């Protein structure tokens, strides 16, 4: 049954919908974790579980999650601790390994998913050929959010065309994959102990090696912070060139895939200035969507 088809029997359709776990790796995220969890809680269709994996945080991240467990006892918020290794990849892996859903959503601690995010993920995975999915993001702490969402969507669709649909890249702030797909690639994913690569691109390339289909879903929208623009030019350059290092690790030489690097480099200074002006002139709470 495709994502657009229905059996006509509401009970059967509900039974076929996959259970969606939401996994959120977190390190010193006290400033954003509450808004992230509130967005994950208030969904048109509830998540099977919402897992925060605390990775040796030294701030109040874990305390805030525990407080929210008390405030929202009906919500399936789970707090796990990954204190063996510092880093996103071991923390991500720990969360995905412990998730019990049919589909494993993965977002960042600064993500603010749209109210129908879980529902859109379920719809996408009703197509049994889909093994992973990703969607566009809107930068909620930037001006012109509606334009930004459209631009992000267009850029990601352009990437698909440039890659001639050979590679469909996941975006770590807004992605999901089947538990079976994760189990297939789990042992092969790069540990990246030097922290040189984009872990979401690495996941995507391992999925491609097994011919596991990644679907781009424009309706699967998440907000995220543009806080990356706070990086120094040197740190930002290192972040952007992670694309190259990830491609090299997988012996991917398609020149068209360098397009995101060009885009990210070209927007850094104007976007950084725009965000600084916007931050000074506004004190609005986080809003969902391109509003």
What kind of region is each of these model predictions?
Residues 39, 54-63, 84, 111:
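A conserved acidic beta->alpha catalytic loop
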Residues 193-203:
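Acidic donor-binding loop at a coil-to-helix junction in glycosyltransferase catalytic cores
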Residues 8, 29-42:
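Short, well-formed alpha-helical segments that are part of the catalytic scaffolds
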Residues 19-21, 49, 202:
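Cell-envelope/extracellular polymer assembly enzymes that use nucleotide-activated donors
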Residues 116-146:
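Conserved donor NDP-sugar-binding/catalytic core segment of glycosyltransferases
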Residues 104:
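Short aromatic/hydrophobic "clamp" motif used to bind/position activated sugar donors
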Residues 135-139, 147-168:
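Short, flexible, basic/aromatic active-site loop/helix in glycosyltransferases
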């Amino acid at each position: 049954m495709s994502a657009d088809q229905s059996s006509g029997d509401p009970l059967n359709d509900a039974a076929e919908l996959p259970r969606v776990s939401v996994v959120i790796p977190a390190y010193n995220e006290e400033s954003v974790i509450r808004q992230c969890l509130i967005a994950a809680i208030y969904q048109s269709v509830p998540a099977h579980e919402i897992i925060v994996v605390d990775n040796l945080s030294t701030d109040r991240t874990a305390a805030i999650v525990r407080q929210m467990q008390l405030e929202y006892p009906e919500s399936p918020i789970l707090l796990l601790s990954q204190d063996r290794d510092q880093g996103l990849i071991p923390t991500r892996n720990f969360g995905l390994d412990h998730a019990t859903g049919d589909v494993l959503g993965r977002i960042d601690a600064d993500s603010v998913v749209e109210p129908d995010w879980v529902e859109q993920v379920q719809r996408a995975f009703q197509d049994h050929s889909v093994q992973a999915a990703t969607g566009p993001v809107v930068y909620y702490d930037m001006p012109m959010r509606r334009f930004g969402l459209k631009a992000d969507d267009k850029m990601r669709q352009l990437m698909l065309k440039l890659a001639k649909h050979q590679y469909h890249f996941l975006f770590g702030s807004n992605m999901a994959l089947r538990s079976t797909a994760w189990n297939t690639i789990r042992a092969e994913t790069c540990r990246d102990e030097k922290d040189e690569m984009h872990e979401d691109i690495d996941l995507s390339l391992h999925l491609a090696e097994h011919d596991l289909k990644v679907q781009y879903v424009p309706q699967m929208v998440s907000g995220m912070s543009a806080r990356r623009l706070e990086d120094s030019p040197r740190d930002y350059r290192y972040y952007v060139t992670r694309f190259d290092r990830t491609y090299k690790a997988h012996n991917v030489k398609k020149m068209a895939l360098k397009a995101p690097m060009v885009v990210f480099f070209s927007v850094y200074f104007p976007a950084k200035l725009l965000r600084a002006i916007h931050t000074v002139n506004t004190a609005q709470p986080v809003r969902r969507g391109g509003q």
